Swiss-Prot record:
Signal peptide boundaries: 1-24
Tissue-specificity statement: Female salivary gland (at protein level). Female saliva (at protein level). Not detected in female midgut, head and carcass (at protein level). Not detected in male tissues (at protein level).
Localization (cell): Secreted
Consequence of gene disruption: RNAi-mediated knockdown results in increased TNF-alpha/TNF levels at the bite sites in the host. (Microbial infection) RNAi-mediated knockdown has no significant effects on P.berghei infection levels in mosquito salivary glands. P.berghei sporozoites isolated from knockdown mosquitoes and injected into mice via intradermal injection cause lower levels of hepatic infection in mice.
Residues that carry a glycan: N323
Additional note from the record: Mice that received antiserum against the protein show a decreased parasite burden in the liver after exposure to P.berghei-infected or P.falciparum-infected mosquitoes. Antibodies against the protein are not generally elicited by natural mosquito bites; however, active immunization of mice leads to productive antibody response. Active immunization of mice with the protein results in reduced parasite burden in the liver and reduced parasitemia after exposure to P.berghei-infected mosquitoes. Antiserum against the protein decreases P.berghei sporozoite motility in the murine skin.
Record-given protein name: Salivary protein TRIO
Function text: Required for efficient probing on a mammalian host. Alters the local inflammatory response in the host skin following a mosquito bite by suppressing TNF-alpha/TNF expression. (Microbial infection) Contributes to optimal transmission of Plasmodium berghei sporozoites to mice.
Organism annotation: Anopheles gambiae (African malaria mosquito)
Domain of life according to the entry: Eukaryota
Keyword Cell division: no
Keywords: Behavior, Glycoprotein, Secreted, Signal
Induction text: (Microbial infection) Up-regulated in female salivary gland following infection with P.berghei sporozoites.
Length: 391
């Protein structure tokens, strides 16, 4: 390998020397001429012009003419014309085009002659370089995969997407590498993937992880993302989310809503999708009267006044009849009175005065007369359902 490299260096030095002879390099002259005029004389003229200008203090914005300087300046091109007419074939010291080409051809022929004996060594050198490069890539490949997986597991999504492009094949091999604890990072990564097939493979892997985790929250997050991502490769995703919503609603009716509250606090975008479906019941159905206290307890646990207000609005929509009034079934009277009584504690209008009008509009829905009773009646019922019967 060293022998081949030395040979290449010798050839380059030889070619450089020959080209140096071809192009030539004129030795500096003690006094150069321009059109037969000494350069020094021209420089002295320029210095004289500058000196006179400084002495006369000619303003920059004013034209100042000096006849002697003008004559000297105009004499230069006339001198060049006269000199060229007297020296039409004066050599310039440089080779003609044909001479340069012939010299280069000769130099290249000499180079080719020197190169022939070294072809075998250069071929060996090329093979050795290829082998070392391939060895380096083989050593780099597992390291690259490890960096890719570690960046993905740590939540550095942009870098993980970059490394995914460097992986071979359409499917990213991540099986048996991640745990359910990595699901949140994997969901962010899957959402960012631009290729539909890779995205589908990643969601399939996440689905396996969330099923093995037995975690309702992870299963819900996975179902919400599948239902909202734009990918024609994904199938049966609406059914998956609908099944998840049915399970969450049943748990809510049974006063078990920790998963929903956790999603509302940590994943507000996912919760917004869930909430719309949670309160939207099939036509002709509504929450049972006995489930309303549990639903109100759930709403009270939501993290913001705006979220609690809009959730109460969605609940009342599910309890609104076709004529725009609240249900008038007797079993809902006391439960609705509890909700009306709890409204001031659900939304703090003193801290959020901008919500006052929305609260007033919502409270107006309770003015629907039920069995001849108004909003004020329901707010004054108290905590005992028997009081509504006695009245």
């Amino acid at each position: 390998m060293c022998r081949g490299l030395s040979a290449v260096l010798i050839l380059l030095v030889s070619l450089s020397a020959q080209l140096h002879v071809v192009v030539g390099e004129e030795a500096p002259k003690p006094e150069k001429e321009i059109c037969g005029l000494k350069v020094g004389r021209l420089l002295d003229s320029v210095k004289g012009w500058l000196s006179v200008s400084q002495q006369e203090k000619c303003p920059l914005n004013k034209y100042c003419e000096n006849k002697i300087q003008a004559d000297q300046y105009n004499l230069v091109p006339l001198t060049c014309i006269r000199w060229r007419s007297l020296n039409p074939a004066s050599p310039t010291g440089s080779l003609g085009g044909k001479d340069v080409v012939s010299k280069i051809d000769a130099a290249m022929s000499n180079f080719k002659t020197l190169f022939e004996p070294m072809k075998a060594d250069l071929a060996k050198l090329e093979e050795e370089v290829k082998r070392q490069v391939l060895d380096a890539w083989k050593a780099l490949e597992p390291l690259q995969k490890e960096v890719y997986r570690s960046t993905l597991a740590s939540g550095r999504i942009e870098r993980a997407v970059f490394y995914s492009f460097m992986e071979m094949g359409d499917n990213v091999k991540l099986d048996n590498y991640f745990q359910p604890a990595n699901v949140e990072e994997l969901l962010k990564y899957a959402w960012a993937l631009p290729m539909h097939k890779k995205q589908r493979s990643m969601y399939d892997l996440i689905g396996q992880l969330v099923q093995s985790s037995k975690s309702p929250m992870l299963q819900t997050l996975h179902a919400v993302e599948l239902a909202t991502v734009v990918n024609p490769e994904l199938e049966n995703r609406e059914n998956l989310l609908n099944d998840q919503v049915v399970q969450l609603r049943d748990n809510l009716y049974k006063n078990s809503f920790a998963t929903l509250v956790s999603i509302a606090r940590h994943f507000p975008d996912h919760f917004d999708t869930l909430r719309q479906r949670l309160f939207k019941l099939p036509d002709g159905s509504k929450p049972g009267a006995d489930t309303l206290p549990n639903i109100v307890n759930f709403i009270a646990q939501l993290p913001s006044d705006e979220l609690r207000l809009s959730s109460v609005d969605l609940l009342l929509q599910s309890l609104t009849a076709e004529n725009g009034t609240l249900v008038q079934d007797p079993e809902y009277v006391y439960r609705l009175s509890q909700l009306a009584h709890a409204m001031p504690s659900l939304v703090d209008v003193k801290a959020h005065p901008d919500l006052q009008q929305s609260v007033d509009d919502l409270m107006a829905k309770f003015n629907t007369p039920i069995d001849g009773k108004t909003l004020q009646y329901f707010q004054n019922i108290g905590i005992s359902p028997s009081s509504s019967v006695a009245t």
